[in-house]
Amino acid sequence: MGFCLALAWTLLVGAWTPLGAQNPISWEVQRFDGWYNNLMEHRWGSKGSRLQRLVPASYADGVYQPLGEPHLPNPRDLSNTISRGPAGLASLRNRTVLGVFFGYHVLSDLVSVETPGCPAEFLNIRIPPGDPMFDPDQRGDVVLPFQRSRWDPETGRSPSNPRDPANQVTGWLDGSAIYGSSHSWSDALRSFSRGQLASGPDPAFPRDSQNPLLMWAAPDPATGQNGPRGLYAFGAERGNREPFLQALGLLWFRYHNLWAQRLARQHPDWEDEELFQHARKRVIATYQNIAVYEWLPSFLQKTLPEYTGYRPFLDPSISSEFVAASEQFLSTMVPPGVYMRNASCHFQGVINRNSSVSRALRVCNSYWSREHPSLQSAEDVDALLLGMASQIAEREDHVLVEDVRDFWPGPLKFSRTDHLASCLQRGRDLGLPSYTKARAALGLSPITRWQDINPALSRSNDTVLEATAALYNQDLSWLELLPGGLLESHRDPGPLFSTIVLEQFVRLRDGDRYWFENTRNGLFSKKEIEEIRNTTLQDVLVAVINIDPSALQPNVFVWHKGDPCPQPRQLSTEGLPACAPSVVRDYFEGSGFGFGVTIGTLCCFPLVSLLSAWIVARLRMRNFKRLQGQDRQSIVSEKLVGGMEALEWQGHKEPCRPVLVYLQPGQIRVVDGRLTVLRTIQLQPPQKVNFVLSSNRGRRTLLLKIPKEYDLVLLFNLEEERQALVENLRGALKESGLSIQEWELREQELMRAAVTREQRRHLLETFFRHLFSQVLDINQADAGTLPLDSSQKVREALTCELSRAEFAESLGLKPQDMFVESMFSLADKDGNGYLSFREFLDILVVFMKGSPEEKSRLMFRMYDFDGNGLISKDEFIRMLRSFIEISNNCLSKAQLAEVVESMFRESGFQDKEELTWEDFHFMLRDHNSELRFTQLCVKGVEVPEVIKDLCRRASYISQDMICPSPRVSARCSRSDIETELTPQRLQCPMDTDPPQEIRRRFGKKVTSFQPLLFTEAHREKFQRSCLHQTVQQFKRFIENYRRHIGCVAVFYAIAGGLFLERAYYYAFAAHHTGITDTTRVGIILSRGTAASISFMFSYILLTMCRNLITFLRETFLNRYVPFDAAVDFHRLIASTAIVLTVLHSVGHVVNVYLFSISPLSVLSCLFPGLFHDDGSELPQKYYWWFFQTVPGLTGVVLLLILAIMYVFASHHFRRRSFRGFWLTHHLYILLYVLLIIHGSFALIQLPRFHIFFLVPAIIYGGDKLVSLSRKKVEISVVKAELLPSGVTHLRFQRPQGFEYKSGQWVRIACLALGTTEYHPFTLTSAPHEDTLSLHIRAAGPWTTRLREIYSAPTGDRCARYPKLYLDGPFGEGHQEWHKFEVSVLVGGGIGVTPFASILKDLVFKSSVSCQVFCKKIYFIWVTRTQRQFEWLADIIREVEENDHQDLVSVHIYITQLAEKFDLRTTMLYICERHFQKVLNRSLFTGLRSITHFGRPPFEPFFNSLQEVHPQVRKIGVFSCGPPGMTKNVEKACQLINRQDRTHFSHHYENF
C-alpha cells in the first residue's frame, strides 16, 4: 500500500521536476499550497482547510451564531478590566523583542484567520458611553467594526456540523511566510534568475507589492496613507503590518538569496529551478529548526519530546485554540517602542515622520507604515534587527501597552481599534470554548475559584480578578478561554496556553512528511540535518547582516546579563512620540456634490431630449407652414392687417395657445399659427367694449369684455406690445362708433373676472335645457335648476343671447351656411344680431308643437328672402341649396334644377314662377301626418297621451289603410310593440322609405302590400343618476374591453410574478450572497424591475410582428386576443417599461450610494470577480460605478437612448416630426445590443435577459425578413389626384402576387422622401381591382410633402411620379359575406371600415354581370354622431350610383339623441326628416341611405327580414365594432334562431 501511494505521488509531482539528462533534484519537491503532504489525507494542512477543534464549538445556536451580550461581557469593558496597566515593565524571563516578533512571523507562516468571510457578517464592538479613547463625547452610539472571518463552506449547517473557520495559509511550518501559500504566489516572488527571489532597485529589498501579487495593503492608521507603494512582496499576506515583522521578512528574503548565491558558486551548472529548490529546502529546514528548537523553548520554557519520525496518522491541522493562545500571549510582550542599534552597540535615534528624533521607533505609529524615514536602507533594517535582539520585551502578564490595546490598526472607517477586544470577538467568532471546558478537555486540573486561576496575581492585584468575575456575574463557567488563559499567565504562558501551544507544535513536527529531520523523505542527509540543527537565528543574522558574531548574544530570543549590547533602559511611553489619534472617516466624503450633479444630469436626459425634439419640431413646423402656405390662398387673400402675436388664456385648467390678433373694419379676428380663424368678434354700435388691463406681473395681460359673448384674454411678452394693441383697438373702436371703458386689476383678479369659453358653454347648456323644458314640458329637475344662491353668471343664463356663431355651432353648421342665415334672420326679430331666449323659444315652439300649417308657414317665411309673400323658383332653389350646403354639395346644379322642375310639375305648378304660401303648403300635402306627429323624442320624457292614443287607434287599422308613421309606434311601450308587431302590421309604409309620390318621380314602382323592414330606431329612457351612469360606463368598459383586460391581466401577472420572484429571492433567499445586508431596498427594487423590464422589452417585439399578427387575426385566437390593439398594447408595454426603468435606475442609484460607502471587504464578497480584498478598505467612488463599469456605462447610455426614443415617440412630437420619430425609433437595435451587454456582465447575478429575449427576437427577425423580402420592390404610381380637404388620392401598380382582403392596410415609403420612412394607410381599393389605391389626408409634414410631390407633373405623368416602396398587407379582411344569398353587415363606429371594400366589390361584380351568389346586402352602421362618417360619404355615394340592381340597402343609426338637450342634434333631426321626404336624400350625407336616431332594433329587423326574404333559409350576419354592439347582434340572432325558420349565422369582429 505504501509503495502504491509513493508511486502515485511520484507521478503526481513529476511536473515539478525539471527534465534533463542530469537531474540534481533527487527528492520529492514540497508543494507550496500544503496539499498532499499527507498521502492519505491529502487536504490536511493545505491552504483553505478548516481549523481543528480541541474542544467542541461553543455557539449560541449550536451552529454558527456567536455568543455575546448579555450572556458575555462587553469586549471593550473586558479589555479595559484585564489589559489596562502600566507600560515599561521588563520581561521576567528577559525575552527579547526579536523573539516576540519572530513568534508573530511563525504564526503568519502557520495560520491566518483575519481575512473577512463572505457573505460579510459583522460582530461590531459596542463602545461603552464615555470611553476616553473611542467615545470621549459620550455619544453612546459608537461601535468598532469587526467582520467575521472566513469559514469552511461545508460546515455551519447543523448542530452536528457547526461552523469551522478556514485557514488562509498552509498549516505546515513550510516557509509559506517566505515563499507564499500557492505556486502562483511563489512565482510572483521569484526572479527566475539564478534561483533567487526577485529584488527591487536595492538588492537587499524585494520588489514592491504589485499585481498579480496581492499583498494586504491596509492604510496607515497614523497618516492615512494607502496603496501598495512602500509595501514589499513577501510570502505572508500581512508581512508588512509592522516594520519589525517586515524586517524579519527581509531577513529571510536575503537569507534565501544568500543560499542561492552560495549554491550557484558551488554548482555553476545548475539551472534556476535547481538553485531555487535547493535554497528553498535549506531555508525551510533552517526556519523549522529555529522555530521549534530555539524559539519555542524560549517562548514556553519547555522543550518538545525527541523526534521519533514521521507519523502519518497524526492530524497536524492548526487548532482554533492555538490561534488565540499564541497570539494573545505574544501581544502582552509587545513594547511601546523598539530600539535601533548598530553592530558597535550604538543605540541610534529614530527620525519620525514629523522630522523629530526619538530614542525608539514608536509601535503605534508604525503599523502599515510605508517608506519610514528611518528604514530607507538595508543598514537601517539591520539596525532594527539588532535593536530588537538587544531589547527586553514587556512583562509576561495580562497587561497590554496602549499601542496594542487602544491604538491597534483598525479599518479605514475607524483607524484604531482595541486589539484585545478584537481578539475576544474573534474567539467568539471561532466558537472557542469556555476556559473551564478547555482545561477539562486538555486534561488539566479543574478550577473552581477565581483566585485559583492565578494565585500570584490574586496575591499582588486581586482587583483584576474581582472585576473580571463581576463582569461574568461571578460565574466561572462563562469565563472565556482567551481572558482565562491570559489571566493565568505569569512569567510564562499559563498551563492552558502552554499545553495548547506545545501540543500543536508536536503535531506540526511529527505529522509533517517534509520535516527536515525525516530521513525517509530524501531531503537531507544526516550530516546536513546535523548542520541544520546547529544553525541558530544568530547564525542567520550574522550571515545576512555580515557582522561579527560577538555583536549578538548566542540566543537572540533571550538576553542574559553579560550579553553584548544591553539596552539603555526599559522603554515606556515616556519620551516617545504620542500615538496618532483614531480617525473616523466617511467613505462618501467629498463625493456628495458630484453624486448630486451626476443624478441631476441623468434626470436631465428627458429634458435634453425634449429640447432636441422641440427644435426638430420647430424646424419641421416651419417647413410645414411653408408647404401649407401654398394651399391657403383663400385665407391669405383676406386682408388681415395689423396682426399681433399673443397667447390666449382659455381658462385655469386649459393651456394657453398662441394666436394672432387682426383688426379689421367692424370686427376683430383671432387666428392660430396656421392662419385658421379661431374667432371673429363683430363690433357694431351700440355695443360697449370694456378693457381690463393687468397692473402687476409685468403688466402684460389684456382682458377684452364683449357683451353677450365670452371674454378674450391675451398675454403678451412685453407691456409695450400690449399697449400697441390697445392703441390700435381704441382707434378702431372710435371709428366704429363704439364706447370704451377701461380699468386696471391685478392679474389674478382679472382672470377670475373673465368669462371663459367653458363658462359660456355651461351657460348655454342651461339655456338650452330650460328652453326645451318650456317647449316639451320636461321635468324641471331634468332640465337643471337655477338655485337662488348660484353665481351671477348662472342666473344670467335665461337672459343671455346667442351670437350667430354660437347658433351655428349648436346646429353643427357653419355660420355662413344659407340655412343658418335664413333661420337666424327669421328668429332675430329685433335685428340686434343675437337670439334671445324668447326669440329662440318662439321659433322652436313652431317646429316642435306647431300644426303642419304653422310649420310650413315658418319654412315659407324663412326662404321668402325679399319678404313679398311669394317664393320664386329661384328662392325655392336657394332653399334646397341651403340643405345641399349642409350635405356637403352632394348634388350638382343640374340635378337640383331637375328636382325642382319635377316637384313643380308633380304639383301642377309647372307654369308658375312664384309660389304663395298656399301653393307651398300644397306641395307639402303628403307630409301632413309627419308634420302633425313630429315630436322630439327625449330620453326620460313620457310620451304625451295623445300620441299613445294615436298608436292604439293605429293598431286597429286594416291592411288596406295607411297606418301612422312607425316613428309613433316606436314611442309605444315594448308590450304594445310586441302585440301589435304582426305580419300585417309590417306591411304599413314606413317613413324610412320614400313616399309614393317621390318614388314615382324617380321611376320607382311601389307595391302597396309588400313586406317592409322594421328599421325604426329603438330609444331608451335616459338615466341622469351619476351613480347609474358610472356603473353603466364601467359595465360597458368591461364588456367592450374584456379581451384587452384579459390579455393585459395575463401579461402584467407574468411581469408582476417575475418582479415578485426576484424581490422574494433577494429579500429572503439571498442571504448567502450578503448583498441584501448591504442594500436591501435598492437590490430588491433594481432586480425585481430588471426581471420585469427584461420580459417587457423582449415581448414588446411581438407587438410589432405585423405579418404574424395579420395571420393570427384570421385564426380562432382572435376571439381571445385583440390583435387589432397591438399598437396600443405596444404603447402600454412601453409606458410601463419606462416607469419600471426609472424605478430600476432609482434602485441602482441607491445601490451605488451604498456600494460607495461599503468597505472593500464587503464589496469583495458581493463582487468576487470584480474586487479583491487587499485590506485597503477604500471603496470605489460613485463615478467608477456609473462610468467605469460595463453595467454602469451601458445603463447611462441606455437611459439616454430611452429618453430620446420615448420623447420622439410621444403623440405630440410624432405628429410634428414623424421622420424624427422614425429615425430615433430605429435606435431600438442599439437598445437591444446594449441591453444584452448590460446584463451579460453578471455583476450581481448570472445573465437572464436571453431567457426572455431569444424567442421574441427570433420571431421578430423572421417577421422582418418577410417584410424585407417584399418592401424593397419599387412600385410605379399610375395616378395621383389632389382632392379637397387636403386629401391625396394615389393609385399605383399592384405587385405581382399581391393578394389582400377588404379592410386591410399597407405601409408605404416614397422614394423622393426617403427609403426608410414608412407610413401606414388603409387600402381603399377593392380586391378585384387591378391597381391599388390610397386616400391620404395631409395631416403632417410627411403627408403634406407627399401632396406637394404628387402635384400635377409636366411631361409623361407615369414616368414623372416618384415611385413607392410597399409593405403589407396587414390586418384582417371580412370575406365570408359572399357565401350567403342575403348578408347583413353591421358596423359600429370605426368598424365600418372593412365593409367599404365589400360594398364596392359587390356592386362592381353585379355591374359587370359577374356571377355573384349574394343577392342582397343590408348595411347597418351604428355611430354616435353624424360627424363620424363624413369621410365615408363618397364611397357610399359611389355604391349608390353604381347599384342599378338595388343590391345594397344602407341604414345609418345616430345614437346621440336629445337626451342631453343638444340643439344641434334636435334641429338636425327635424331637418333630416323634412329633407328626406322632400328630396329622398339624407340631409347629413346627401345619400339615399336612411338615417335614424337611436339604436337599431336588431330583433324586429331580423324578424322582418324573414318576411321580406321568405325563400332564403340562411342569412349571414357580419358585425364589426365594440363588443357591446356585437353582443346585442349575437343575442338577437340567438333569439331568432330559436324559431324554426330562417337561420341567422353570426360572424363578428371586435374593434
Swiss-Prot record:
Function description: Generates hydrogen peroxide which is required for the activity of thyroid peroxidase/TPO and lactoperoxidase/LPO. Plays a role in thyroid hormones synthesis and lactoperoxidase-mediated antimicrobial defense at the surface of mucosa. May have its own peroxidase activity through its N-terminal peroxidase-like domain.
PTM comment, free text: N-glycosylated.
Localization: Apical cell membrane
An annotated GO cellular component: cell leading edge
Name assigned to this protein: Dual oxidase 1
Chain residues that bind Ca(2+) 2: 864, 866, 868, 875
Keyword NADP: yes
Region ranges (Peroxidase-like): 26-593
Family, per entry: In the N-terminal section; belongs to the peroxidase family.
Gene induction: By forskolin (at protein level). By thyrotropin and the Th2-specific cytokines IL-4 and IL-13.
Gene source species: Homo sapiens
Enzyme Commission code(s) on record: 1.11.1.-, 1.6.3.1
Pathway note: Hormone biosynthesis; thyroid hormone biosynthesis
